[in-house]
Amino acid sequence: MRTSYLLLFTLCLLLSEIASGGNFLTGLGHRSDHYNCVSSGGQCLYSACPIFTKIQGTCYGGKAKCCK
C-alpha cells in the first residue's frame, strides 16, 4: 500500500512539472553551443580568433567565440 502511494506521488510530481512549463524536460534534445561549434569543425576560444578564421557563433553561453 505504501508503495502505491509513493508511485502516485511521483507520478503527480512528474505531471505537475510537465504542465507547469516543463523545466524538467526543456533541456532534453537541446545541444549546447559548445557541442554545436565543435561538431561543425570549429573551436571555442576566449581570446581573438586566429588568422584566417572567422567567428561562426558563441560558446559557453556567449562567453567565448566559435572560430572556424
Swiss-Prot record:
Keyword annotations: Antibiotic, Antimicrobial, Defensin, Disulfide bond, Membrane, Secreted, Signal
Disulfide bridge partners, by residue number: C37-C66, C44-C59, C49-C67
Domain of life, source organism: Eukaryota
Alphabetized InterPro entries for the sequence: Defensin_beta-like
Subunit record text: Monomer. Homodimer.
PANTHER family assigned to the protein according to its UniProt record, in alphabetical order: BETA-DEFENSIN 1, BETA-DEFENSIN-RELATED
Protein name: Beta-defensin 1
Organism expressing this protein natively: Gorilla gorilla gorilla (Western lowland gorilla)
Lineage: Eukaryota, Metazoa, Chordata, Craniata, Vertebrata
